[in-house]
């Protein structure tokens, strides 16, 4: 599997350009934090854990260009850059979690020298990257108990190695089951409008030798009606305190279909995706993207010019439709309002700075 991102050691961050997959494998060379911000905005790097790790490295690039006489001045400039990075994607909470973790490291740091502070920032970014991979593998081990022998798994969008620092969340469970010899197979919904399921999930599964069948999003109901899938597993971009889950648009529809056809609907996400500051999914800011993503396909128009378009990137699945949430600290089952809070107890979640979305809603 290709690296989602790699730090070269000489102030260069390389990001796999996922807009070009599966037909071209190329990396974007980022030497400025603005390069990282642009890559996140245009979905060259995507997936909540991946953009969190990328933004952490982006803040390192920003710090290296700051010229300040005091630590206070350094922090002021760094916080401004963090706000810019946070504004790139308002829904995925991992982005804001990672940036606040980086800023907290600076607030608690003893050195006053900018060079030493930059070294500490790099160490923290690398820790975020490493911890995501180990956390994903741990999550997969927990989730294995929910994946039976021969399971036919329906998934949506891409929550694999490409969406993380490595291994994956929802697809990490699939990968672990495959490695355990459970003969699993995958149905990948294409995931309009940007086709992450067709372009990325199908490609990942083929690379791993895991049987995969591609379907259009509108086929999911009939697939379940015909009894061709045993369970649904998806990732998450933000989980509210009551267990409501924001994920790629179309996830809610799958949850409703899974309930109708009485099959389990699982969410796999690290605890950094849980946002206890939001009581329910109604408070989650939902990103809306450009109409051209819907009216054009591969750069060619597929709709009449001038048609009105609504293009939310995410939807919210109510907690009542979710069978269990698989995290890197264990499996969480209802009642979610109690058990999610217990799951994140002991984690340092205190804000250093409030990173606010463009619509004015707090993202943490």
UniProtKB/Swiss-Prot annotation:
InterPro entries: IF-2B-related (IPR000649), IF-M1Pi (IPR005251), IF_2B-like_C (IPR042529), Initiation_fac_2B_a/b/d (IPR011559), M1Pi_N (IPR027363), NagB/RpiA_transferase-like (IPR037171). Keywords: Amino-acid biosynthesis, Isomerase, Methionine biosynthesis. It holds the Pfam family IF-2B. Its EC number is 5.3.1.23. It catalyses: 5-(methylsulfanyl)-alpha-D-ribose 1-phosphate = 5-(methylsulfanyl)-D-ribulose 1-phosphate. Coiled coil: none annotated. PANTHER family: METHYLTHIORIBOSE-1-PHOSPHATE ISOMERASE (PTHR43475:SF1). This is Methylthioribose-1-phosphate isomerase. It comes from Pelotomaculum thermopropionicum (strain DSM 13744 / JCM 10971 / SI). The gene is mtnA.
